[in-house]
Amino acid sequence: MVMLDILSNALIQIKNAEIVGKKQAVIWPVNKLTYYTLRVLQRYGYVGEIEYIDDGKGGKYIVQLLGKINDIGPIRPRYPVKYREIVQWEQKFLPARQIGILIISTSQGVMSHIEAKERKIGGVLLAYVY
């Protein structure tokens, strides 16, 4: 089976596991972008421990879920966003100010929209979570 967007697949696996009330989600297949996105989610308290298992087929992550995710999803297409436009995208994808995060891939790595605004850099929108 060919995966066209590994990050989107990972986010949907997390969302489905949260909906049915599971305590953990198995993310497979994985890549570095998925890992860095999971680290941002972990930093903001949306997921718990992230464990990598090398199964000889590309590996997989076991993510501990904390039950704090109401909605999570990829942003497709991946829009380029300038520093000054982040607030507009925040209003479009998040339910209210100060609730949830946008995940942005920047030249300085994958980070939340909050960090991107602090550093005054833009990037490409990857996902939203609240």
From Swiss-Prot:
Annotated S-S bridges: none
Example GO BP: translation
Any single GO CC term annotated in Swiss-Prot or TrEMBL for this entry: cytosolic small ribosomal subunit
TM segment ranges: none
The keyword Transcription is annotated on this UniProt entry: no
GO MF annotation, one: structural constituent of ribosome
Leader peptide range in chain numbering: none
InterPro entries for this protein: Ribosomal_uS8 (IPR000630), Ribosomal_uS8_CS (IPR047863), Ribosomal_uS8_sf (IPR035987)
The entry's keywords: Ribonucleoprotein, Ribosomal protein, RNA-binding, rRNA-binding
Pfam family, one: Ribosomal_S8
Source organism superkingdom: Archaea
Quaternary structure and interacting proteins, as annotated: Part of the 30S ribosomal subunit.
Similarity section: Belongs to the universal ribosomal protein uS8 family.
Functional summary from the UniProt entry: One of the primary rRNA binding proteins, it binds directly to 16S rRNA central domain where it helps coordinate assembly of the platform of the 30S subunit.
HAMAP family per the UniProt record, alphabetical: Ribosomal_uS8_A
Protein name: Small ribosomal subunit protein uS8
Organism this protein belongs to: Pyrobaculum aerophilum (strain ATCC 51768 / DSM 7523 / JCM 9630 / CIP 104966 / NBRC 100827 / IM2)
